[in-house]
């Protein structure tokens, strides 16, 4: 059977950037790695309802700078900035260094792989038909301007006795093209029948000479005239 490399891992340093940026020697590397993992788990648990897509961690000179990419920044910031200040204090205590938190708003959540996967998983948990959930997400992404999108769900779909895999795709998703900007994400839907895995690939265009092609909404296909 064909084995597929992680779409983001193979593009690191080409069209994708690392989500943790710091330098450590052999003695502190494992400590930093574990600390980053704990920070991400803590933030994802605290900000479940904030539609968080990605958490970037930078460690410049005995400090930590954490950037939270979210579609709902108001929930993260809270009333008069109270929630984000409490997060900063908790993370400073947890990491042992001064922490600065930046909030980046995601203006097009329909084109973010993690947010699309979360949306499909939440619909599956509400017992929406998996085909309807996938088709709706694909149509929204193509309408906003994606060049291609593929969604795959695996598990006991519809409460079936035997688990299976179903997928839906529109447009192009060129996994072998390294300059292709492909957003890949996975998420789990916890249903009464068990766990259903959701995978999303979104092709946003090719990065040529360090500049990404401009995303434009797909024009609707011309209607064919009925024969008289």
From Swiss-Prot:
Pfam entry (one): KH_2
Annotated signal peptide: none
GO-annotated cellular components: cytosolic small ribosomal subunit
InterPro entries, alphabetized: KH_dom, KH_dom-like_a/b, KH_dom_type_2, KH_sf_prok-type, Ribosomal_S3_C_sf, Ribosomal_uS3_bac-typ, Ribosomal_uS3_C, Ribosomal_uS3_CS
Disulfide bonds: none
Domain spans labelled KH type-2: 39-107
Entry GO MF terms: mRNA binding; rRNA binding; structural constituent of ribosome
Key words of the record: Ribonucleoprotein, Ribosomal protein, RNA-binding, rRNA-binding
Any one biological process term the GO annotation gives: translation
Role this protein plays: Binds the lower part of the 30S subunit head. Binds mRNA in the 70S ribosome, positioning it for translation.
UniProt similarity note: Belongs to the universal ribosomal protein uS3 family.
Subunit structure: Part of the 30S ribosomal subunit. Forms a tight complex with proteins S10 and S14.
HAMAP family: Ribosomal_uS3_B (MF_01309_B)
Full protein name: Small ribosomal subunit protein uS3
Source species of the chain: Pseudomonas fluorescens (strain ATCC BAA-477 / NRRL B-23932 / Pf-5)
